[in-house]
UniProtKB/Swiss-Prot annotation:
PANTHER family: TR-TYPE G DOMAIN-CONTAINING PROTEIN (PTHR43381:SF5), TRANSLATION INITIATION FACTOR IF-2-RELATED (PTHR43381). Residues 449-618 form the tr-type G domain. The keyword Protein biosynthesis applies. Belongs to the TRAFAC class translation factor GTPase superfamily. Classic translation factor GTPase family. IF-2 subfamily. Residues 504-507 are annotated as: G3. Its main location: cytoplasm. The keyword Repressor does not apply. This is Translation initiation factor IF-2. The gene is infB. One of its GO terms (cellular component) is cytosol. Gene3D superfamilies: 1.10.10.2480, P-loop containing nucleotide triphosphate hydrolases, Translation factors, Translation initiation factor IF- 2, domain 3.
């Protein structure tokens, strides 16, 4: 159902003559029960608006507006008394004549009550008679004054009868503005009105009218000529009006309104006759006047339009060019003034002033009171949408037990609670990722066998990379720092059983996330356990990660060629973690292998192929590619480089790719041997170039239709991630306040971590954060991939941080900038070396413990005052040794009166560093000159002891 605004309702009422201001209309609607209306822009349903319109119209019935005039203005005529001409005619019986009532000029209804003259019966083409409005209530007294005699009232009903035409009269066309003539005497027949043009020559027998003083008086008594009571009297002789002279002109304006000007003159074709009371006077010259505005627009003037009528120009219409040529300048001016008769005259509109101006109360529409958010919204954004001060929202949140700032993110439920108090509702809007990344149904006919993905996991130094080197017939382990793997590597190996994709994961405890990612994307897990070392912590962690991912575990007991190898002991230890060998009746395959002698490697590959057949690994290569990011890094000259594993579809160069908050178009792809490839099928790893940033290892990637769709998905994920990071608002508890106060007193080491790959950056950051203790904390200001840049140095300088570089080095220029800024750069290639060095930096932040170490005592025997030197205490060393660099306490009567440092130490006249027990010396105390005989000087030194982190 449609709606109507309040100001539209006001316009509709104004058309009916009811003028209400916006505020008055709002108050009126409130009085009628429409309390939801707040201002002129508020909306009402159509049925409500119609009901309110009818109620207001019923309460304030406007007076009927007078009819719109069809003519140019009022018509005011002048009348002259004429004597009927003497006409010799044969005697004839008098015929009944119509009776006339007194004319009522102000009554539009009088026009409707009488028939027009015969010559006006044929109107002009296209002219329509104007409908007369209803007579106003005040017309009755006027009619009573116009017809005071009872006879006139009795003659009124006979007025509507039509006047008979006079056949003997000449057929002269009447003027366009000819008006109804007065009724003839009782003995005369009605005649058509005479034209008022004075230019015609007088007929023969013309004689001037007698002067006004010689005219007999008109009697108003009943029975006098022209009165209703004279119906039975003999008629007076007719008088030719052309023989009479017109009297003085008298203009009468009947019921002229002020503004707007209303004209009641009907068109010429529809003009009606107005009967007048019979009397001795007849119509003479007729002048037509029109009411027009004055020259200044503040008054009214009467303009004679009779001459315009005689010249064939209709009043109130603009003159043509031909007519303008025949008029003088004065006549043109008068015509221009007369054309302004229809211009409404209004007073000057007053400019609105600020003083006294009422404030319009506006309110948003209901459909605008809906706030749509996704996961969260900031306090500032919510305040702007609702038009509420942010401080009020923060105060309300504090009352709810939530400590927030103006830029803090609040969840949708909290926002809904705040919005409900201000009349708003909150709706969660979702971003449908399925619109860009649709799910494709599996078509069994298009599935093909893909290579198995095998992840090699285990403890550090148990030979995982060496085992892969033996399978690939390569030597990757020799090139790794410290002989340990610190990156996750992906290799595709062609074996007699078919292609197999291997993922090599680090075994160090810091690379837990890498091992978990490897377990998530794999089909099989080869758990490598050293036969001489047994099950270790990272071995147990790898077992848990594989079981959590729900993948099959195949155990390879490595280093069986060593003399101290004990495979049986390893198998026994694995049973504690529900891994029972097939030889012992279990379901887990356990093979003894040796990476050095390549013992058991063919059997391992055969078991991998057998397990892949059991799992029925298939994929559809015809669909859009999808998979996971295994590793990512930032290389100079190449930009962001991501190592991805294609799980479904085929990845091609030029595809639009989106992963996490990054997107791009595949510019190039390279396999593990550095060879460029154009497409990669499911089950194979590849390096991808062309992303907008370094993605997070472990994120999924998808190929979409175009780069625009990829950008939209990435931007949505970035916004959602930011809202999630800022949206964590927790209730403030007393425990949190105590913990915060305790943390504020804790020393914190700020770090900026830069690594060669994203996985190493993540692992190093986690390892360094775990090194924090109760005394010293570790805060990672920034963790990124790539070389150390000037921006990293400036960030570290601003945060008083140390830069940790892992497998990356800064340029010489960057080292100079760091030296100028006082920033320390530490570079490492092995992760445990980085952890040990950072612990030393953390210990350096702790203030050392000051410990007092006694040296000796001396007794003052004599005091010497030496000019320009000061007071010297001649003392004898009674205990230990007195050193010149030591501290001293002056003890008098077992009370310490001063604590300071020894300023000078002499023996006889020589300065000495120390004086042993049993010798005398002179001791000068800095800042103290009140040494007395008998005082004891206790000498000691302060020793700093470095605190431990534990």
């Amino acid at each position: 159902m449609s709606k109507k605004r309040v100001h539209e309702l006001g316009k509709q009422l104004k058309e009916q003559g009811i003028e209400l201001s916006n505020q008055e209309l709002v108050e009126k609607l409130h009085a009628l029960g429409y309390l939801e209306v707040k201002s002129h822009s508020s909306s009402l349903e159509d049925d409500q608006a119609h009901a309110a319109y009818e109620k207001i119209l019923a309460e304030r019935k406007p007076k009927p507006a007078p009819a719109r005039p069809s003519g140019p203005g009022f018509v005011v005529r002048k009348r002259a008394h004429v004597e009927p001409p003497t006409v010799t005619a044969p005697a004839a019986p008098p015929s009944p004549e119509p009776e006339y009532a007194e004319p009522q000029y102000a009554e539009p209804q009088a026009e409707q009550a009488y028939e027009p003259e015969p010559q006006a019966a044929q109107p002009e083409a296209g002219a329509e008679p104007a409908a007369a409005p209803e007579p106003p209530a005040e017309a009755a007294p006027l009619a009573a004054q116009a017809a005071p005699s009872p006879g006139a009232e009795a003659a009124a009903p006979a007025a509507p009868q039509a006047q008979p035409a006079q056949p003997a009269a000449p057929a002269a066309p009447p003027a366009p503005t000819a008006q109804p003539s007065a009724p003839p005497p009782a003995a005369a027949q009605p005649r058509p009105p005479q034209p008022s043009a004075p230019s015609r020559p007088p007929p023969p027998g013309y004689r001037p009218a007698p002067p006004p003083g010689a005219r007999p008086p008109v009697s108003a008594a009943p029975g006098a000529p022209g009165q209703p009571g004279a119906a039975g009297q003999p008629p007076r002789p007719p008088v030719d009006p052309r023989t009479l002279r017109p009297t003085s002109t008298q203009a009468v304006v009947i019921s002229r309104p002020l503004v707007p000007v209303r004209r009641v003159t009907p068109p010429t074709s529809a003009r009606q006759q107005f009967p007048v009371a019979p009397g001795p006077r007849a119509l003479g010259e007729v002048r037509e006047l029109k009411v027009v505005p004055g020259s200044l627009g503040r008054e009214r003037e009467f303009i004679d339009v009779s001459r315009d009528k005689r010249r064939g120009r209709q009043p109130g219409r603009p003159i043509s060019e031909e007519q303008a040529k025949s008029l003088s300048g004065k006549e043109l001016l008068q015509a221009a003034i007369s054309d302004r008769a229809y211009i409404p005259i209004r007073g000057k509109k007053k400019k609105p002033t600020k003083k006294g101006a009422k404030t319009q109360i506006t309110e948003k529409a209901e459909h605008k009171k809906v706030i749509r958010i996704e996961e969260s919204i900031s306090v500032s954004e919510l305040s702007q949408v609702m038009g509420v001060k942010a401080s009020d929202l923060i105060r309300k949140l504090m009352q709810m037990g939530k400590m927030v700032t103006i830029n803090a993110q609040i969840d949708a439920d909290t926002a809904a609670t705040l919005a409900l108090e201000h009349g708003y509702t909150v709706e969660k809007k979702g971003f449908e990722v399925e619109e860009f990344i649709p799910e494709v149904e599996v078509d069994e006919s298009k599935l093909v066998i893909r290579p198995p993905v095998v992840t090699v996991m285990g403890h550090v130094d148990h030979g995982k990379t060496s085992l892969l080197d033996a399978i690939r017939q390569a030597d990757v382990a020799a090139g790794e720092a410290g002989g340990i793997t610190q990156h996750i590597g992906a290799y595709s190996v062609n074996t007699p059983q078919g292609p197999i994709t291997f993922l090599d994961t680090p075994g160090h405890e810091a690379f837990t996330a890498m091992r978990q990612r490897g377990a998530q994307v794999t089909d099989l897990v080869v758990l490598v356990v050293a036969a001489d070392d047994g099950v270790m912590p990272q071995t147990v962690e790898s077992i848990k990660a594989a079981k959590a991912a729900g993948v099959t575990i195949l155990v390879a007991i490595n280093k069986v060629d060593k003399p101290q190898a004990a495979p049986e002991r390893v198998m026994q230890q694995l049973t504690e973690y529900e891994l029972v060998a097939e030889q012992w009746g279990g379901t887990t395959i356990m093979l003894p292998v040796s990476a050095r002698t390549k013992q058991g490697i063919p059997e391992l590959l055969e078991y991998i192929a057998l397990q892949s057949e059991v799992l029925e690994l298939k994929a559809n290569p015809d669909k859009l590619a999808a998979g996971r990011v295994i590793e990512a890094k930032l290389e100079k000259g190449r930009g962001p480089v991501a190592t991805v594993l294609v799980e479904e579809g085929t990845l091609r160069v030029g595809d639009a790719l989106v992963t996490g908050v990054h997107f791009g178009r595949v510019r190039a792809m390279m396999n593990e041997r550095g060879e460029q490839v154009d497409n990669v099928g499911p089950g194979y790893p590849v390096e991808v170039l062309g992303l907008s940033g370094v993605p997070v290892a472990g994120d999924e990637f998808d190929v979409v239709e175009d780069e625009k769709a990829a950008k939209e998905v990435a931007q949505h994920r970035a916004t959602k991630q930011r809202q999630k990071e800022l949206g964590g608002v927790k209730k403030a508890t007393l425990e949190d306040l105590f913990a915060k106060a305790k943390t504020s007193a804790q020393k914190v080491l700020n770090l900026v971590v830069k690594a060669d790959v994203q996985g190493s950056s993540e692992a190093v950051s986690q390892a360094l954060e775990k090194a924090a203790t109760k005394k010293v904390g570790v805060k990672i200001l920034e963790s990124a991939v790539g070389a150390i840049t000037k921006s990293d140095v400036l960030t570290a300088a601003a945060g008083n941080a140390v830069i940790v570089g892992f497998n990356t080095k800064p340029e010489t220029e960057i080292e100079n900038i760091a030296s100028q800024q006082g920033v320390k750069i530490l570079m490492f290639g092995i992760i445990y070396e980085a952890v040990d060095r950072i612990r030393e930096e953390m210990a350096g932040l702790l203030e050392p413990i000051i410990k007092e170490k006694p040296l000796g005592k001396a007794e003052v025997r004599q005091v010497f005052n030496i000019p320009r030197v000061g007071q010297i205490a001649g003392s004898a060393v009674t205990e230990g040794v007195v050193k010149r660099a030591g501290h001293v306490r002056v003890v008098r009567d077992r009370k310490v009166v001063f604590t300071g440092k020894i300023g000078s130490l002499k023996r006889v006249k020589d300065d000495v560093r120390e004086v042993a027990q049993g010798f005398e010396c002179g001791i000068g105390v800095d800042g103290f000159s009140d040494v007395k005989q008998g005082d004891v000087l206790e000498v000691y030194e302060l020793e700093e002891i470095r605190q431990s982190l534990d």
